[in-house]
Amino acid sequence: MFKKNDRSQSRERRHMRVRKKIFGTAERPRLSVYRSEKHIYAQLIDDIEGKTLVAASSAEKGFDGVGSNKEGAKLVGKMVAEKALEKGLKKVVFDRGGFIYHGRIKELAEGAREAGLDF
């Protein structure tokens, strides 16, 4: 049976494999997602300059949902999309962070798409 340590190491290895292929620019930044047990985090990153352009998470003050469920993840997706559109960013590259595209990760992506991001 897999232990939690094995799972996190496997996720990190998957993420490194994916990161070899996915790259964000200023025109099309990388939408990076991280999921913990209690919260979910999303940020748009310009990999050329190594800067975070926009960030949103369920741990922010003023967040109305619960970060450990799908509804909260969808709200975070909408929040990051609204902040990105304010800065004039519409197209992004989605980086699931080594997590399976299912559940909270999928809901965050759908929330960002509904709010206007294109990926």
Curated annotation (Swiss-Prot):
InterPro entries given in the database record: Ribosomal_uL18_bac-type, Ribosomal_uL18_bac/euk
Assembly notes: Part of the 50S ribosomal subunit; part of the 5S rRNA/L5/L18/L25 subcomplex. Contacts the 5S and 23S rRNAs.
Protein name according to UniProt: Large ribosomal subunit protein uL18
Disulfide bond residue pairs: none
GO cellular component, one term: cytosolic large ribosomal subunit
Chain's role: This is one of the proteins that bind and probably mediate the attachment of the 5S RNA into the large ribosomal subunit, where it forms part of the central protuberance.
Lineage start: Bacteria, Bacillati, Bacillota, Clostridia, Eubacteriales
Organism expressing this protein natively: Clostridium botulinum (strain 657 / Type Ba4)
Family designation: Belongs to the universal ribosomal protein uL18 family.
Gene that specifies this protein: rplR
